[in-house]
Amino acid sequence: MGKIIGIDLGTTNSCVAVMDGDKPRVLENAEGARTTPSIIAYTDKETLVGQPAKRQAITNPKNTLFAIKRLIGRRFTDNEVQRDIEIMPFEIAKADNGDAWVNVKGDKLAPPQISAEVLKKMKKTAEDFLGEPVTEAVITVPAYFNDAQRQATKDAGRIAGLEVKRIINEPTAAALAYGLDSKKENQIIAVYDLGGGTFDISIIEIDNFDGEQTFEVRATNGDTHLGGEDFDNRVINYLVEEFQKEQGVDLRNDPMAMQRVKEAAEKAKIELSSAQETEVNLPYITADATGPKHLNIKVTRAKLEALVEDLVSRSLEPLKTALADAGLSVSEINDVILVGGQTRMPLVQKKVADFFGKEPRKDVNPDEAVAIGAAVQGGVLAGDVTDVLLLDVTPLSLGIETMGGVMTSLIEKNTTIPTKKSQVFSTAEDNQSAVTIHVLQGERKRAADNKSLGQFNLEGINPAPRGMPQIEVTFDIDANGIINVSAKDKNTGKEQQIKIQASSGLSDEEVEQMVRDAEANAESDRQFEELVQTRNQADSIAHATRKQISEAGDALTAEDKAKIETALAELETAAKGEDKAEIEAKIEAVIKASEPLMQAAQAKAQTNQAGEQQSSAKDDSVVDAEFEEVKENK
């Protein structure tokens, strides 16, 4: 069995590692670097990846692709994609299935197809080191990646010729890397992962017992559209605006000039992590009728921090949510680990230290920790590492739409995966022959406020009164966080299932918005839930009353029946509205109008009871006739 390599497929940079004996080793690429820029360039003759692609970007901006991870598993209509369209020099296009793809030299390319080029380079780097073919890998993704994005990442691996043995979350992988060198018995760590395009926070408990380590994720949260690229864009916009003020020329219309500004902005941002001031000097950036123009702008660390302070602050809200979900206070966190190149920024380190009340660890390499952890997990799957157990979680609740437009959760957020959960549901109408299983992901009570992952029908249900058929719905989340849903009629044994497809995943903004909305709208959610319960009560009463009318037959006068029917019609109209009090009033009206129905039912019951007693008395006399003393009286 060959080695299972670990790959950190990053937005800005990627990294590959492998177990070398009992230690993970980060591998150097063909250019001698331990990380590879996640940049792909398509020229007339070849496809370039990494540093060679980056070097020619200025002369080939429309066919040099970067930050493709921000598009993977996304719909073209997502707000984040629309924002990226405005700032990316290459053309983002709408695919036939509605996904966001990229136009390159007249061809539409899917993000997994493009990302596969980076994975191929990682694969080749590992093969050069090991001297043998590599066919299996563990690939990391942001913890807050949804099902669509995880599926798309697996697709990228497959396109690159790799069997993806496991998709694991980046903060969890970093915790594995940290745990290798930590021999403390029990500890709880926070992994703050601010990469090139995504942000994650995970609270992880590490237990050392009898030589074995267990890594259990207690909670995770994040913002999958927040990262170093956003910091770069703030600097780019500042430089472009300052140049326009000075020279009266807008560089945004010149892709080649913008590529130079982008590289200079990234370089300035990095330099300001160690220096208080830097100078961006780009001679001959453009020209007009008066001659060539040169860009020369000084940027201070204070200016940079002012430009990005709100981005850093945005990362603190998920920290609070993750701690609350884990049921922990800041004081219970033993260590804070920083992952991702953007965490080298002093302002980020200060904000994190202020939040946790302790300095983050500096002994974990933020660029390499994730790949190292992926290699460790590869070792676990290959059987080379036997003393490590990893327990990860699903970041959002999963469930189905039930009567009244409510989302009924089967698996709550932060549930350890892999996991499987079943629940029995039934029909909402008499003689219903089919049910639609509508799969949802999110935290809101109202089904429409969550994201639809897909739906399917279970047909061939035997005719029966509503509430009688038993439909068992099962959610199965594998260790990659990928979802399968099935529905089975327990009476007939008929079953249908759906594997959630990549094209139906959530947008990252929707994921974040769901959690924020759930917290901000707890009261409106409660009111909606009460409204639905009242509607369902109205429906049940209407159904039961009509059944009783049918059973009462001639025992109910035409006048009483008309009153009840009028009250029922008013109740059904009210139940379609949003006024809970109105529905409750109409329920009371039906109950009042149904009093003659109750009396008729009671009278009928008494008549039946009297008949039974009379029949019983006759039976008794027949029995007595068999006794000898009765015969003597004759």
Swiss-Prot record:
Keyword tags: ATP-binding, Chaperone, Nucleotide-binding, Phosphoprotein, Stress response
Low complexity bias locations: 599-610
Source superkingdom: Bacteria
Expression induction or repression: By stress conditions e.g. heat shock.
Disulfide bonds: none
Any GO MF annotation of the entry: ATP binding
Functional note: Acts as a chaperone.
Name used for this protein in its record: Chaperone protein DnaK
Lineage: Bacteria, Pseudomonadati, Pseudomonadota, Gammaproteobacteria, Pasteurellales
